[in-house]
């Protein structure tokens, strides 16, 4: 059986990257929440 996590750098950044987050309203909300919480890393 194929495992669910098949690492791929391009997909990772396209889906969870900073620019992907900034491109939508809700993505910006995610970043704002993570900043408020004090996360060292905001996005993949």
Swiss-Prot record:
One of its GO terms (cellular component) is ribosome. Residues 1-19, 26-44 have a biased composition (Basic residues). This is Large ribosomal subunit protein bL34. Keywords: Ribonucleoprotein, Ribosomal protein. Belongs to the bacterial ribosomal protein bL34 family. GO terms for molecular function: structural constituent of ribosome. The gene is rpmH. It comes from Geobacillus stearothermophilus. It comes from the Bacteria. GO terms for biological process: translation. InterPro entries: Ribosomal_bL34 (IPR000271), Ribosomal_bL34_CS (IPR020939). Residues 1-44 are annotated as: Disordered.
């Amino acid at each position: 059986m194929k495992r669910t996590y098949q690492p791929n750098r391009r997909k990772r950044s396209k889906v969870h990257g900073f620019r992907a987050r900034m491109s939508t309203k809700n993505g910006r909300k995610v970043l704002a929440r993570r900043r408020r919480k004090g996360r060292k890393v905001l996005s993949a």
